[in-house]
Every structure is written in C-alpha cells, then in structure tokens.
Amino acid sequence: YTFKVMKKIFIIVIATLFFISCNDSQKREQDKKIPVEQDNGIGDGAPSLSTAFAQGVEKTHNKEAFLAHNNISFDIALNFNGQERLKGTFTMRTNSSKIKFESKDGKTIIYNGEEVYLTPKEAEMESARFDILTWPYFMAMPFKLTDGGTIWSDVKQVTEKNRDYSKAKLTFEAGVGDTAEDWYQVYVDNNTNLLNYAAYIVTFGKSVTKAEQEPHAILYENYVVIDAIAISDTWKFYNWSEEKGLYGEPIGDATLSNIQFLESADYTVPKNAKKIEAPN
C-alpha cells in the first residue's frame, strides 16, 4: 500500500514539474520579440515585418557601432551633369543632431540642431540649407532607417537586372525635417543585406506633384568597412521610375574620402554668420 501511495505521489510530482516547465518555456517564447504580420505587429512590443526589415539592414551596416562614436567626418567631391556641385568636408554627430560643412572656397554651413547658418555673412550659397541636410543624410541613411517619424510600407521582393532585392517605401510623419513629404523607395541586396540603392523625390522648395515628375536614385556603388561599420564611399545618381528602376547613364556621382570618426568636434556658430531660413 505504501509503495502504491509513493508511486502516485511520484507521478503527480513529475506531472507538476512537466507542466511548470512547459509553461515556463511557453512564456519565454512569448517574451521574445519576433516579427509578426505587416500591420504594425501584435503582442507586447513585437515589431512588424517592415520594421524588422529596416532593423535588419541597420544591423548589417552596424548601426550600434556607428552610434557608439560621437562624430564622423569625410571629404566629399560631388558632381552633377559633368559639373562640380560640391566639394569640401562634412563633420557631423553620428546621430545627425549637429552638422558642419566647410567648402573648399572658404564658406562654412552649420546646423546646430535647430537652425542653419552660413558664414561669412556676405557669402552667397543658394543651396546651403539643402546641402547641409541632404548629403549627410545620404551618407548616414543605412543607420537612420528606424529614426523617429519613419513610416514603412510592406516589404516586396523584386528582381532588377538579374539582381534580387527586398524593397520597401519609406515615408515620414508630418513635421519631420524640412521636407516631410519626401519619400524613398529602398532597395536592399538580398545577398548582402546592404542598402544597394534608394529612389527618392526632393520636395525642397517645390510641390510633391512637381517632385514626383522627376524621381532620382542614389546607388551606393561601393562600401568600405571602417571599425566594422559599412559605409559607402562611392555614389552614383540615376533617373528612376517604378517600371524601369534605375535607367540611363549616371546623372551624377560622389566620392567620399578621408572618412574618420572623431571624439570631439566644434559646431559653434561664428558671430559673422547669417541664418538660412527653411523653404516656405
């Protein structure tokens, strides 16, 4: 009789432990943040497939290591339609909160996190505000895909010129930057998971309707790895359409050189600077 009772107790204990173990395992699985359906995800903090896609690209480029540095600087030589468009040195916080551009002809543009300034006061540079905000964004784009105010469409699989891509449209919440109505069509190489190219419109100083008549694209033609961080040092610009993708000959190009991370940088606005207002 004692043996039967002990046997029953033993079976009950084993069953209880098994039940607890199953529940604990199930809870751990539920606690994992896994991608779910496209519609913004469900559950406790689970990302959508689109967000997981953007996070995956940032991880491939090593966003965490990029943001671990305080500042980055690089020389840029930018050309459009066979003409020099911009040449000088950008210095910026890795989170883009402050940016400085020093041109080869002695002009300096500074974004101090709130306003844009040009020095010296008598300098004329019609594109100063556009330049200080646009080209640094293109450099840092692979690290900014999940910034506040970003909105992602569903991810699609496409093939262009025998190359397979994951593609999604990036838009922005109202009030983000100077031109929240800009959009990007982001193409990620399925073999490397690096950002290959991004089609875009520029609404700076123009309507969306006008901008959508001439979409362009930036092709990140080459990547260098600095401190385990993938940064593109060679850009090509093309015309683009939804039907054709990139087409025609390049309409512009840029070369980045002397790319380096800096512990400190000076973003002080000089006294002889003038403020550059945002477009209406």
Predicted regions span which residues?
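Short, hydrophobic/aromatic-rich segments at coil-to-beta transitions
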Residues: 68-75, 94-100, 161-170, 196-197, ...
